[in-house]
Design a protein with these regions (language model features):
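A conserved amphipathic terminal alpha-helix motif
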Residues: 447-484
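Glycine-rich portal/gate segments that line the openings of hydrophobic small-molecule binding cavities
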Residues: 335-344, 348-415, 468
Length: 484
């Protein structure tokens, strides 16, 4: 068993690597500036958590104390101008403190790219960070990867949103740059296997998927899997600045993230030294479309990061909306003066003869669904407790946790996939925090238009629904109580 530190635990790589490390019996310590962001993650109670800032001397020393292997999974790309300098300063501090703590090995996820091609500042920063980490004197395994194909990866999210939302794409030259994308599961496998890799000093290992393609082929391959028809028109000139503004306009990516990504697309990022295939013979990299399919299989509410904890208990309705990893989440929270069991009973008895809120609206939606070839609004629900797989009108129970939560998946005809989730969390001795999440994973531009067209209707329907649940729970007027 190794004592392992994972930095960047709240990120899409670190958060998925931790379960693999725990499965193999390692003691895992995670570090974050704000540990409350980790509290709702499924592995939170299985790890040691330290609140620390990797830019502060004492914080880094405390995080590395007693550690055998440290994963360095952070960089400052989204922090504005000067990120290159901050990356190197942070790496130097981490290396110095690792040496003082007698850390055996640092494992760092870097980026592919050959210096002879004139690397962009972002790619150059990633590689120079590896050299600065090597100053600590112990082993450094630097895994250089191309675009990672998986939910949360910024290059993949850019490909996803552009392909989903733009039927006819005007493509600059960078769209035809050669790349070697790698599936998220393969990256995690390489990272986990690097703990026991035999090697000394600074080892640079290039990792990639099984295919070398272009960014344009990444988009057309994604479209093929999603059943979307896309037309690409090549143009001779479209500056990185204009391209990044276009990406920012079309996708949820912030401009501070979009620009370094777009600028980096002019560099070929392919494996030149395939030694990883010999060093890790147990890992057989996926092809691009297999990696995309794996990412799409993960397109469900559980793939999203938890909602941020509310700063205060809401006396009235609090609404939060995010667009992340291909899913839009509209979250409503309300304090209810009732036990969490009463709140759970209230939302698990919705549907059937009890109905919902604004029943006429649900009936109208059911009639439209029936006309489009869907099942329509079936007045049905189990007579007792709901369980996974049960039908509740035009919803299917996808998951239920007794006394805590209910997740329903829509069986309506939709340009995408939709879910409705309710959770009850005890907030104090006399009340419960009721949370209602509506999720939608739009398919193509039609799905995006559908979501925004219905937004004006969402407010009265979903606001009324959560208030009705709160009223039923507070009054004790739910079906289960009436049967006692």
């Amino acid at each position: 068993m190794k004592h392992i530190l994972v930095t960047g635990a709240a990120g899409y790589i670190g958060g998925r690597l931790i379960p693999l490390l725990l499965e193999t019996g390692h003691h895992v310590r995670v570090v974050a500036r704000d540990v409350t962001r980790l509290s709702d993650l499924p592995w939170a109670n299985q790890v040691e958590t330290i609140e620390a800032d990797l830019n502060v001397d004492d914080s880094v020393g405390r995080a590395l104390e007693g550690i055998d292997v440290a994963y360095y999974l952070v960089h400052s790309m989204g922090s504005g101008e000067g990120f290159h300098r901050r990356d190197l300063e942070m790496a130097n501090l981490f290396a110095r403190k690792a040496r003082e703590a007698n850390v055996e090995r640092i494992i760092y996820l870097s980026a592919l790219g050959h210096e002879s091609t004139g690397l962009t500042e972002h790619l150059r920063s990633r590689q120079e960070t590896g050299r600065h980490l090597a100053n600590f004197g112990g082993d450094v395994i630097e895994l250089r990867a191309g675009p990672v194909v998986g939910a949360g990866s910024l290059p993949f999210e850019m490909i996803r949103y552009l392909t989903e939302r733009v039927p006819v794409m005007v493509c600059p030259r960078w769209v035809f740059t050669k790349v070697q994308p790698i599936g998220l599961s393969d990256v995690l496998a390489y990272l986990a296997a690097s703990i026991n890799l035999k090697g000394k000093g600074h080892e640079i290992i290039e990792i990639g998927g099984s295919e070398i393609i272009s960014y344009g082929q990444m988009m057309t391959g994604y479209a093929r899997i999603r059943g979307l028809r896309r037309v690409m028109i090549r143009v001779p000139v479209l500056t990185p600045r204009l391209s990044s503004l276009w990406v920012h306009l079309i996708t949820p990516l912030r401009g501070s993230f979009a620009r370094p990504i777009v600028e980096g697309l002019r560099n070929e990022v392919v494996v030149h030294d395939p030694q990883a295939l010999k060093m890790f013979p147990e890992i057989v990299p996926l092809g691009y479309e297999s990696a995309v399919q794996s990412a799409l299989d993960d397109l469900r509410p559980s793939s999203l990061p938890p909602t941020r904890p509310l700063p205060v208990i809401p006396e009235d309705l609090v609404i939060q909306t995010i667009n992340n990893a291909g899913i839009i989440r509209e979250s409503r929270s309300k304090y209810v003066a009732a036990s969490h069991q009463s709140v759970f009973d209230a939302f698990t008895t919705l549907g059937g003869e009890q109905g919902w809120y604004m029943d006429w609206g649900w009936r109208l939606r059911g009639a439209l669904d029936w006309l489009l070839g869907g099942p329509g609004l079936r007045r049905t629900r189990p007579s007792g407790d709901v369980k996974k797989g049960d039908l509740v009108d035009f919803w299917r129970v996808e998951n239920v946790t007794q006394g805590q939560s209910l997740l329903l998946r829509a069986e309506m005809k939709l340009p995408g996939d939709a879910w409705l989730e309710f959770t009850a969390t005890s907030s104090n001795e006399t009340g419960t925090l009721l949370t209602q999440n509506s999720y939608f994973a739009p398919k193509g531009l039609a799905g995006v238009i559908y979501w925004y067209a219905l937004l004006p209707i969402h407010k009265p329907v979903f606001n009324g629904l959560i208030r009705r649940i709160a009223t039923i729970a507070a009054a004790g007027n739910h079906r289960r109580s009436n049967s006692k």
